[in-house]
């Protein structure tokens, strides 16, 4: 049986610590915008998909893009809808699905929040450089947002 790694050399523990530090920085930066981290991710994903795909995204497409659970995505989108940041409507293709789009105020907030988060990311990942950070993270967790949109 081999000896376990010292904590300073444990990749899992190091990743855990880095993730917590990054999440704390993001959470603090989003607080003045009255957004939680998950609300930001889903609002920004909705905005990005609306801007970059030919049809309004469904809740399922947003969940797939963000890598979030479908049920949790639905709950968070409902909360964003209650705040007037997104509109959810029956999907014209699939009556079971809901299409989502940001409202004008949701789009403004998404743009502002993305700029805030990108600034945090720039500073946070500066010690290793953005390209190296993206290369490593892409190898560890392939970008699911590049998957093709689902029909549902």
Model-predicted regions and their roles:
Residues 3, 46-47, 96-97:
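Short secondary-structure capping/turn micro-motifs that flank functional sites
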Residues 20, 24-69:
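N-terminal helix-turn-helix DNA-binding core of bacterial DNA-binding proteins
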